[in-house]
From Swiss-Prot:
Summary of subunit composition and partner proteins: Interacts with ERCC1. The catalytically active form interacts with SPDL1.
Organism this protein belongs to: Mus musculus (Mouse)
Catalytic activity: Thiol-dependent hydrolysis of ester, thioester, amide, peptide and isopeptide bonds formed by the C-terminal Gly of ubiquitin (a 76-residue protein attached to proteins as an intracellular targeting signal)
Organismal lineage: Eukaryota, Metazoa, Chordata, Craniata, Vertebrata
UniProt name for this protein: Ubiquitin carboxyl-terminal hydrolase 45
Record region (Disordered): 1-27, 405-552
Protein function: Catalyzes the deubiquitination of SPDL1. Plays a role in the repair of UV-induced DNA damage via deubiquitination of ERCC1, promoting its recruitment to DNA damage sites. May be involved in the maintenance of photoreceptor function. May play a role in normal retinal development. Plays a role in cell migration.
Chain residues that bind Zn(2+) 1: C38, H40, C127, C130
Basic and acidic residues: bias regions: 1-14, 405-414, 450-466, 521-533
């Protein structure tokens, strides 16, 4: 039995039951009074329309703000205060927001009243006509019924469920295009990419590759195991086309394709690039450790590694078609066929078809007027930025011998004629010797290229810096299987570029070789040389030293069946190198070495030269400087073998030792022009260079156009282009570097647009679906700024004001 605690009183039930009911609060009483007097509820509320609209739209998202496609951290940047129209169910931001879409909807409703709205966060009902709050008690149970439905719907809706956002945007955009007669043309979306730790350099490049629509299209064609691949031989029409079955793509290629595919899916938010980045780190270990890296180096390693995988894939399929021949089983006829098909097949990999161009270096001896050209492939063009500073005057006395030639040939282009010695880095001039007479200007290093197989003939010995060139690939013997002749170019480059920014000018002022060499091909980290009887130049030797890192791999490859040596032509760009001896009777393939007899045609461009203005700093002015004519004199003189041979003939009585040492160095002119344009043009603005013992960044703004005409910088012999024809490119991607050398951040500006049908037809060689119409002139679209997971639509002017580091242009046909 419990005893009552005298300190506690039992509740008095009677008194509690008799207590009068009080209103919840004063506000609710006011709401009732106001609601009872509102005359708009009866015809400004529709339960059926609201239920239908809520079921078809995203919850608590302003539909108008959604059309602007503003995102942050992969989620839409939308106002928290969203109001729903109780007449039609439209959701818009409140009157306290910046856009006030809900209020605008009410004002633009016309004759039909849309004045009653409800806040989806506070459940406050408001009448724009009365400018007062309403209560759910007015007009019987209509408002109470709607509020109850909306609250239940909000409870069922998961917070942060924005998976349908981009999908709805694309459906609306596609519906609008169908009305305009553009059915089937969809605008890809833009998603943020998670930063794994100092991987903004990677994210910015991937964002631009994701907007390179032709890349995904070509990868999609050959993504599966067993894909049919047809190889036709234009050089050997007597051989029938070969149809091979490709194996599965390599791990990096597969990871890249899957990631680009995920970037196009509408159901996902920010993506994690962990799988793709890990695959790249396996090919290029230098990117491990989540350290700050360079975007351009990342781009080259990525494309090079993917190209290596595709090359091996194509070569393996060709060997499989011939039952995997070996040294013992393959006869001469089989070897010739494998080499012929391999040479043409490797050129069909999608990296070469999209990104690779060709640059021609033309050098003319001023004494004998002999002209020679050398063609180098490139993946991008690195352009130095001219800083606003007063230059030291050049001693004109050293130029007296070339002044008349400069004035006659370049009268309309005076500013482009440069003296090679004047542009030589200070460090190079300091360490140069009298034997450096054949040293080229360091501007030769401004182009980043992939060498063709016939050019990969340099072996550098660190002790004596001798260069040895190999015979043409056609003279090489066949020893083992084709797929064993390849090495991983990406891993080799990782060791070459692990300590220095390969694309900054910091790597340029290196000590020049003291021994003359034959010829150095263009390139920064993938240096190769070929013997060139008319252009023995020495300044490129420091770059050639970089090839020593892969010498052991090359020696092993040569010991096997060397079929890769002949699977390349002028547009073939293997990264492997073959350390072979130089025969005295070395023959050169047609196209690699050409004698020209007309100086006027040698330096002719497709159109008139670009005219720069005072203090101009633009992409055009940088290209103008890059392709301007140089005078090779002083320590940069040309060792002309024609002049040397003529002098030897005049002194037949001299000894053989004197003949060997009696080289003739002459003044020469040199110019670089583009001889084959790529489908996708990548320009690299060299913002990082060496200042003393440290690196510094050039922060000067460089103007870049939306539409670039490349014709003034192309040779008159440019492939598939007639003289006078324009070579137009449209800007679609920017990689921006903000900050300094010690701490910076990479972001991307990409143009979301309709894929170019004409460019696709040109590269793939087939017609697209009939009835598709492509807009005349520039394709429409909008610019998006992407900083890791932050995505925001920006005006075109903001994109053009970016501090560009990489520029992506696509060909306009």
């Amino acid at each position: 039995m419990r005893v009552k605690d005298p300190s506690k009183d039992l509740p008095e039930k009677g008194k509690r039951n008799k207590r009068p009911l009080l209103p919840h609060d004063e506000d609710s009483s006011d709401d009732i009074a106001v609601g009872l007097t509102c005359q708009h509820v009866s015809y400004a509320v529709s339960v059926n329309h609201v239920k239908k609209a809520v079921a078809e739209s995203l919850w608590s998202v302003c539909s108008e703000c959604l059309k602007e496609r503003r995102f942050c951290d992969g989620q839409p940047v939308l106002p928290a205060d969203v109001w729903l129209c109780l007449k039609c169910g439209l959701q818009g931001c409140g009157k306290n927001s910046e856009s006030q879409h809900s209020l605008r909807h009410f004002k633009s409703s016309g004759t039909e009243s849309h004045c009653v709205v409800i806040s989806l966060s506070t459940w406050v009902i408001w009448c724009y006509e009365c400018n007062e709050k309403l209560s759910t008690h007015c007009n019987k149970k209509v408002l109470a019924q709607i509020v109850d439905f909306l609250q239940k719907h909000a409870f069922k809706t998961q917070t942060g469920a924005f998976s349908r956002i981009i999908k709805l945007c694309e459906e609306k955009r596609e519906a609008g295009e169908i009305k305009k007669g553009k059915k089937g043309c969809t605008v890809p979306s833009v998603k943020g990419i998670t930063n794994l730790g100092n991987t903004c350099f990677f994210n910015a490049v991937i964002q631009n590759l994701a907007q390179t629509y032709i890349l995904f299209e070509l990868m999609n064609e050959i993504k599966e195991d067993g894909t049919k691949f047809k190889i036709s031989l234009s050089s050997a029409p007597q051989l029938e086309p070969l149809v091979v079955e490709l194996s599965s793509p390599g791990p990096l290629t597969s990871a890249l394709f899957l990631f680009l595919h995920s970037m196009k899916e509408a159901e996902k938010g920010p993506l994690s690039p962990k799988v793709l980045f890990n695959q790249l780190c396996q090919k290029a270990p230098r990117f491990k450790g989540f350290q700050q890296q360079d975007s351009q180096e990342l781009l080259h390693h990525l494309l090079d590694a993917v190209r290596t995988e595709e090359t091996k894939r194509i070569q393996a399929s060709i060997l499989k078609a011939f039952n995997n021949p070996t040294t013992k089983t393959a006869d001469d006829e089989t070897r010739k066929k494998v080499k012929a098909y391999g040479k043409e097949g490797v050129k069909m990999n999608f990296i070469d078809r999209i990104f690779i161009g060709e640059l021609t270096s033309t050098v003319m001896c001023e004494e004998c007027a002999n002209i020679s050209t050398m063609k180098d492939p490139f993946i991008d063009i690195s352009l130095p930025i001219i800083e606003e500073r007063v230059s030291k005057p050049v001693l004109l006395g050293k130029m007296s011998k070339c002044r008349s030639l400069q004035e006659t040939d370049q009268d309309h282009n005076k500013g482009t004629v440069t003296v090679g010695n004047a542009h030589q880095p200070r460090a190079s001039r300091k360490h140069s010797s009298p034997n450096d007479k054949n040293q080229l200007s360091h501007d030769r290093k401004h182009l980043r290229k992939w060498p063709s197989e016939e050019e990969k003939t340099v072996v550098t010995h660190p002790k004596n810096d001798n260069l040895e060139a190999s015979p043409p690939a056609s003279t090489l013997s066949t020893e083992a299987s084709l797929n064993e002749s390849l090495t991983d170019g990406s891993e080799r480059d990782a060791s070459l570029e692990s300590s220095v920014d390969a694309d900054s000018e910091a790597s340029e002022p290196e000590i020049a070789s003291k021994q003359p060499v034959l010829l150095r091909s263009r390139g920064d980290s993938c240096g190769h040389a070929e013997q060139h009887p008319h252009l023995p130049l020495a300044s490129e030797l420091p770059q050639a030293k970089e090839t020593h890192g892969g010498e052991e791999e090359m020696a092993e490859a040569i010991a096997e069946l060397h079929l890769s040596g002949t699977v390349t032509g002028n547009r073939d760009f293997h990264r492997e190198k073959q350390p072979l001896n130089v025969p005295n009777n070395l023959c050169f393939s047609e196209g690699k070495h050409t004698r020209l007899h007309s100086a006027q045609n040698a330096f002719q461009t497709l159109s008139q030269s670009y005219v720069t203005t005072s203090k101009e700093c633009s992409v055009q002015s940088c290209l103008y400087q890059f392709t301007s004519m140089e005078l090779l004199m002083g320590n940069n003189k040309l060792l002309c073998e024609d002049c040397t041979e003529k002098r030897r003939k005049c002194h037949k009585e001299t000894s053989s030792a004197e003949k060997k040492a009696g080289g003739v160095y002459t003044n020469a002119r040199k110019q670089l022009l583009i001889s084959a344009v790529p489908a996708i043009l990548i320009l690299h603005l060299k913002r990082f260079h060496q200042a003393g013992l440290s690196l510094r960044k050039v922060n000067r703004h460089v103007d870049f156009p939306l539409t670039l005409d490349l014709a003034p910088f192309c040779a008159a012999t440019c492939k598939n282009i007639s003289v006078g024809e324009k070579v137009l490119y449209g800007l679609y991607g920017i990689v921006e570097h903000s900050g300094s050398m010690r701490g910076g951040h990479y972001t991307a500006y990409v143009k979301v647009r309709v894929p170019s049908r004409k460019l696709s037809e040109c590269i793939t060689g087939r017609k697209t679906a009939a009835g598709l119409k492509e807009p005349d002139g520039e394709l429409g679209g909008h610019w998006v700024h992407v900083s890791d997971t932050y995505v925001q639509v920006v005006p075109e002017s903001r994109a053009l004001s970016a501090q560009a580091y990489l520029l992506f242009y696509e060909r306009i046909l």
